Amino acid sequence: MVNRRSVLAGMGATAIAQLLSACSGTGKEKLTVRLLKDSIPVQLLSAFRRDQSQQVKLNFKAETQLKSLLKLLEDIHKQNQSPSQETSWLRLPGGNRSSSIDLVTLGDYWLKLAIQKELIQPLPIEQLSGWQSLPPQWQTLVRRDNQGKLAENGQIWGAPYRWGATVIAYDAKQFKDQGWEPPRDWSDLWKREEFRQQFSLLDQPREVIGLTLKKLGKSYNTQDLNQVPNLKAELIELNKRVKFYSSDAYLQPLILKDTSLAVGWSTEIFDIQKSYPHIKAVMPASGSALWTDLWVQPASGNEETESNSLVNDWIDFCWRKQSAEAISQLTGSPSPMANFSRQDLPTAIQDNPLIAISSEVLEKSDFLEPLPETTIEQYQDLWEEVRRNLE
């Protein structure tokens, strides 16, 4: 999901900067973090400071796009490979080298790449109480071998702190006016005639082929598409029914009533619900594609960074119940540790399926795992063949 969550967020980075400039402290211990804007509530930063037994200095800076954070990891790696060619723009305020960054937000989509390119190093967090409570689905995702492939006994390469999914958004007001029932599952895009030419799909083969696989009772991570009966026929039919494909311009048509439904990413839909509360969303009953934001540690080779106890303290702090609830309620993306009931949520979001997602649906959903090159070629060939049927 390369393009997901690339829309600029609100004022999160400014709020973090203001908070830290006011209370960064002068303690000897320092934690330097580069994170995705609005993925951590600013309230947690001051709470973490209060939680420490001694004064600490927090250096948090937010970026608006995950791709920018991946590039930061690449820049750190280049700097470490050629320290004599270090340039001033790779320095942090105060003259510290960028290799002193302790943690960076990384989307799980890029975890394999980051491991293969040696941009990050394993995290020694297996003994943390939070790790012991982290659901197996997330533990499995971040255990990888040195090539970035899933490995049951692999090292831990990331610490998940929030997640989201591909969902179906719809205009509840328009549905009520038309007397339509809300969508419930992917199959509605095929079988409900009133939806024909009324919905948009993400312009990504992994997403569209994946939801079709789910409709057929398969996994998003199916490796041999040729062995899935009726897959091509189902995709061709879906292609006839969709109004348009877009990964970055699907919300405006929904707001303007040019479409009645849109397949999109939960964080983006949560954001527009603040201004357009009639836009609702449903997590498809047969399961969906999942993503997660991770804390990763740059592969700096810096002994001071590796031994920084604040790294583990911060990760474990993010996994605490109160922190998990704050992340879930204030960022629009549930924490993997948020095992609270609906009654624990504010009334306004108790019934918001973007946050209060049922465990049954979650168990049916899939993180997008790395695929072999042969499978990637199958996806691309099938995608191109199906899209040619649009004319």
Task: Annotate each predicted stretch with a short phrase.
Residues 1-18:
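N-terminal secretory signal peptides and thylakoid transit peptides that target proteins
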Residues 24-113, 117:
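Early extracytoplasmic/lumenal segment of secretory-pathway proteins
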Residues 36, 86, 105-110, 204, ...:
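Beta->alpha turn/N-cap motifs
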Residues 42, 70, 115-240, 246, ...:
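Extracytoplasmic ligand-binding site segments that recognize negatively charged/polar headgroups
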Residues 111-113, 261-278:
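A ligand-binding cleft/hinge motif common to bilobed small-molecule-binding domains
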Residues 169-174, 214, 292-307, 326-330:
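A bilobed periplasmic-binding-protein/Venus flytrap-type ligand-binding module shared by bacterial periplasmic
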Residues 227-237, 276-299:
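Periplasmic-binding protein-like
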Residues 325-391:
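C-terminal capping/gating helix-and-loop segments adjacent to ligand/active sites or protein-protein/ligand interfaces
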